Amino acid sequence: MKQIQVDLGVRSYPIVIGRNLMSCGEHFARFLQDKKILIVTNETVAPLYLEKLELQLSSFDCVEPVILPDGEQYKTLAQMDSIFTSLLQQNSGRDTVLIALGGGVIGDMTGFAAASYQRGIDFIQIPTTLLAQVDSSVGGKTAVNHPLGKNMIGAFYQPKLVVIDTDCLSTLPAKEFSAGMAEVIKYGIIWDSEFFSWLENNVERLKTLDDEALAYAIGRCCEIKADVVAEDETEQGVRALLNLGHTFGHAIEAEMGYGVWLHGEAVAAGTVLAASTASRMGLIDGSIVCRITKLFEAFDLPVSPPDSMNFEQFIKHMRRDKKVLKGQVRLVLPEAMGQAGVYSEVSDELLEDVIRCA
């Protein structure tokens, strides 16, 4: 078992990583004493893990869980109402703890509900997808989508604990695992060139769910994320680098319809577009673009946008991106392997050329 601390002063919290952690109630005990507990999960995860978790929490005051539909298209204010209704029906106060049992959608919605209910109650993340384990469960970004933009309604609100049970990956569909690898690869591109090289050399070990390889990859991603969040919790500086590929990627998700492309798939294609943009600007040479592209392909991820999307469709959504400043689209672009920066002086003409040639 590995433990990583997210250092945020009085809001610091541990990330616990290991096998069979959902069967070890002691990890939760100190966070749940004298609390009312509401588990939020979805229709896919509930049959797999809800009973196991409830068994470990049987000595605590657990109320009827909220089971939501599964999918990015359900990450809405309307679906969040189910969480609020349950809390109110149970006369839940600020002594309530929400537990997010699921992937990124469940984690984001549960966190936002926790931030909003009675102006803030505690919550715990138990991420069950690779993408959530290495990215969305750590750092306190909580949100729901709007038809006009992804994650536009939300808050920064930190969990009290993140429990990453790597055994959950054994039930994860291959397509979802690949989507999570897009975020894993991102960390190597923006932060750690040695980690990127390690990923290149361990593709098969990761794809076959080798325990040691998974533990190392997840742990390294969480270490990087914890350091970045500790330095820049609310994304005023270095944390923006974690959005590599996301400006293009969110445009793909919004245009195609949430859930048509998995988030990680859109991030992979978006990251290749960002790398191609950086190459056109002379920030990196073509060999880095090739390495990035080949590694995404090795994990069966898309490396180009949908054929049906044109520049006008991209730019419409990119101009609604949260990083837009004074009307200018700001892109995270690689500057070397393991290094990236934020750029606002990227012409529409260059972007159109990159998208057209993708």
Curated annotation (Swiss-Prot):
Catalytic activity: 7-phospho-2-dehydro-3-deoxy-D-arabino-heptonate = 3-dehydroquinate + phosphate
Enzyme category, top tier: lyase
Its EC number(s): 4.2.3.4
Pathways per UniProt: Metabolic intermediate biosynthesis; chorismate biosynthesis; chorismate from D-erythrose 4-phosphate and phosphoenolpyruvate: step 2/7
Pfam families recorded: DHQ_synthase, DHQS_C
GO BP, one annotated term: aromatic amino acid family biosynthetic process
Keyword Amino-acid biosynthesis attached: yes
Keyword Endoplasmic reticulum: no
Residue positions binding Zn(2+): 183, 246, 263
Cofactor note: Binds 1 divalent metal cation per subunit. Can use either Co(2+) or Zn(2+).
SUPFAM superfamilies: Dehydroquinate synthase-like (SSF56796)
Function: Catalyzes the conversion of 3-deoxy-D-arabino-heptulosonate 7-phosphate (DAHP) to dehydroquinate (DHQ).
Name the UniProt record assigns to this protein: 3-dehydroquinate synthase
Organism: Shewanella woodyi (strain ATCC 51908 / MS32)
